[in-house]
Design a protein with these regions (language model features):
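Long, contiguous binding/interaction regions
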Residues: 1-43, 51-150
């Protein structure tokens, strides 16, 4: 799930409502926790959710996929692939299993952003034999993501 200012605003509002936080200190704490998830103009940020409906299957898969978040990459057509920066707030994996939730940051150079804005493809993938995948982002989705670079 790619994050932007609006999705983070909704998450903050939801947490304030659910936790019945109305005081300024509590609101400031929620803002401090969630604001780092907003793209800063040179990156995209996403929440990776690894979901399995069956609890036992989820346990097996999270163990099988230990550290998979370190194999995720982004690539702008014509440029080298770049590893994502995962879980800056705290380590969510260990040698035995990965977490079901990861926070990812994808950094882009000015040249890469310009290439995306002028038609180059955007690719995301996982460079790991346990789950090899590469996806070229649909043009309409890419256009939405480009708004985070302004």
């Amino acid at each position: 799930l790619f994050e932007d200012r609006l999705t983070i605003q909704y998450q903050i509002q939801e947490m304030l409502r659910i936790e019945k936080i109305f005081d300024s200190a509590g609101i400031e704490e929620e803002l401090s926790a969630y604001n780092p998830l907003i793209p800063n103009g040179s990156n995209l940020k996403a929440t990776l959710l690894i979901e399995y409906a069956d609890i036992e299957q989820r346990k097996i898969e999270l163990a099988r996929l230990a550290n998979i978040e370190r194999a995720i990459y982004s690539q702008v057509e014509g440029f080298d692939a770049k590893s994502t920066i995962a879980d800056e707030d705290l380590d969510r994996s260990n040698s035995e299993k990965t977490s079901a939730v990861h926070f990812l940051r994808f950094e882009f150079s000015s040249a890469e952003i310009l290439a995306l804005k002028t038609g180059s493809n955007l690719i995301f993938g996982i460079n790991d034999e346990r789950m090899p995948v590469a996806i070229t982002v649909d043009e309409s989705i890419k256009q939405c993501l480009l708004a985070d670079f302004s």
